[in-house]
Structures are given as structure tokens and as C-alpha cells.
Amino acid sequence: MHSTSETRSGSWLSVIALALAAFIFNTTEFVPVGLLSDIGHSFDMPTSQVGLMLTIYAWVVSLASLPMMLLTRNIERRKLLVGVFLLFIASHVLSGLAWNFPVLMLSRIGIAFAHAVFWAITASLAVRVAPPGQQAKALGLLATGTTLAMVLGIPLGRVVGEALGWRTTFMAIAGLSVLTLLYLVRSLPPLPSQNSGSLRSLPMLFRRPALVCLYILTVVVISAQFTAYSYIEPFARQVAQMGGEATTLLLLLFGGAGIFGSLLFSRYSEAFPRGFLLAAILALGTSLALLLPFSAQPTWLMALSVLWGMSIMCFGLAQQSRVLRLASDATDVAMALFSGLYNVGIGAGALLGSVVSERLGLAAIGYVGAALALAGLLLALFTALRYAGALKTTSL
């Protein structure tokens, strides 16, 4: 059992448990990116149509995040996480058994509901259970779990899918989720709902213009990211003419770069908050603009993926940190909105990438994403200049 003093003093074991859960959830959200071709082959569908499963998943998360958070706001958080994981596991088993694409989509919707609750509460929980004075590092560790999903989860999911079939990938995630659930139950202390906010928090949050601009910026930049990233596997295979192993390595490098992005965030984000965010968006836009030119040489494309992976991780962490600072009195509502809008961006980007792939060809996805990133950079500049005072709030 966990004593009250342990809960109050914080524990790295609890933070690690949440980071493991973050690894699982981010792996399953994006693992279809590496399996689009295989899933399309199983159901005799083009990758542009299969890729819409990313859009539907993301938009279910975006629509469900706030309502699910409000419905569960009074539930003790450890019990809530257990329920979330049980739904998550059952839905993955259904994914592995899916006999047609609609059934696969139904299972993904179940996973999306679990995702909606998980990410609405996890960042604030990591801050709560962290040792005193280590809240920023706790967020960094949570981000490491997210990064490892890109580094190991998605490439390993692709390797397993190619060797044993994509269904096995989903079954393996279900098995790993069972082990993670057991660790969560053992390591987390009782966590009563705290500062979750309510529906009455929404008008208050939307009266904070810096926070509203932050939310809009998130949608724009994440749309830019997923216009290209959603279709990076078919882009690598068809445009860059890379083989299966090289494509897996490309995904591995992209994810691995996120580790360096999280380190950069931990070291420089508080010292240079404005410049850090602007540099991240500029690097992202540059990476997307160079995607097609660098596809002529696989080694160039792999090197570019490192900059790309670092930049999107830096952006996501910077935005998450700002949400927690600007809405410290209603963290769960604010993070539910952030998670929902982040997934609006994912869904919009995946949908736009599908349209671009069909109308202009896969080769154009980077240029369209770069144009959106440029719009995001201009918005970030406006926000930094207009609301500089609000963004200089106290640290976590």
C-alpha cells in the first residue's frame, strides 16, 4: 500500500508507470502509420483510404476528450486509469480479430475513447506524483515514454507486422498493456480528483487570449506535421524508392530524434521560451519543405528525419508546458482541450494528406505541410509579441 506521506512526497516509480502507459498509448495511435500498406493489402484498399483511419481515430479523441473528462472528473484517478486500460486492451483484441475494415475501425474507436481520457489526465498526474521540485523533469520523462513509442514502438510494430502480420502487432500491444496495467496498479498511490475543473471552467479558459492562441497554434502546426507524417511510409516506398528495412530505419531515426528533442526542451525551454518555440516551428517547416528534394537520396532523407523528429517533439512539449502554466487552476479541462485540439490537428492533417495524395500525388505532401507550418510560425510570432506578459508566468 502507499502511505499518505509517500503520495505527498512523490515517487519516480509512479512517474515511470505513467511514462510506460504513455509509451503504450502513443505506440497504438501511430503504429498504423507503419502498417498502412499491409492493412490496405489485407482489405484490398488504397493507402489513401486506409490512412483515413488516422483521421477518424483522431477526431473521435478530439470530440470525446472534454465530455469524457467531465463525466469522469470525480472518479479517483487510479481507478479511472484501470477502467481506461481495460477498454484499451479489449479494443486491441478486437483489432487483432477484425474480419473487415469497418470492424477494425470500430475497435479503433474504442481505443480512441480510452485515449481521450488518458491524455486528459496524465500530464497533470505526472506533475502531482513527481518528487518535490521535479515537475518539469517528470513531464520530460512522460515525454520520453512518448518518444520511445516513436523510437521503438512504431518501428517494432512495423517489423512485427511485416514478419507475422499486422494483426499480431495489435495483439502484442494488448499483451504489453496487461503488463503495464499491473505495474500501474502496483506503483501508483490513490489519486483523488484534484483541480480537474468543470464545464464552468470553459468560459474562464476561453477568456484567456494567450491560451486561445496557443490552442489555435497547436491545431495549425499539428495539421502541418500530419499532412506529411501520416503518409511517410508510402512516401518512402513509392517516392523515395526505399525498401522495407530502410523505411523502418527512417521511422526509427525520426522517433529517436525525439529523445534529443526532449533533452533540448529540458535544458533550454525555460531559459528561452519564446525563441525555443519559434525555432521548433521553423525547423519543422524546413524539414517538410525539404522532404521531396531530399527524397532523391535515402541518406539525405534519413538525416532530415532527425531534424524533423526533434522539432515536432520540442513543439509538443513546449505547448503542453504552456497549457499547464496558463491554466493551473483547471488543468484537466485545459489538457482535455489541448488533447482534443491536438487530435483535431492530427485528423485534419491526415485528411489533407489523403486529399493531396489523391489529387497532387504523394510527392506534394511535404510542400503542403510546410505551407501550414509557415502559417503557424506567423501565428507564433504574433502570440509571442502580443501576449508576452501572460506567457512569462511562473514555472511549473
Curated annotation (Swiss-Prot):
Main localization of the protein described in the UniProt heading: membrane
Which InterPro entries does the protein's record reference? MFS, MFS_dom, MFS_Efflux_Transporters, MFS_trans_sf, Sugar_effux_transptr_put
The annotated topology with respect to the bilayer is: Multi-pass membrane protein
Return the PROSITE patterns for the record. Answer: MFS
UniProt keyword RNA-binding, yes or no: no
Q: Which UniProt keywords apply?
A: Cell inner membrane, Cell membrane, Membrane, Sugar transport, Transmembrane, Transmembrane helix, Transport
| Family (UniProt) | Belongs to the major facilitator superfamily. SotB (TC 2.A.1.2) family.
Task: Kindly provide the name given to this protein in its UniProt entry.
Answer: Probable sugar efflux transporter
- The organism of origin for this protein: Pseudomonas paraeruginosa (strain DSM 24068 / PA7) (Pseudomonas aeruginosa (strain PA7))
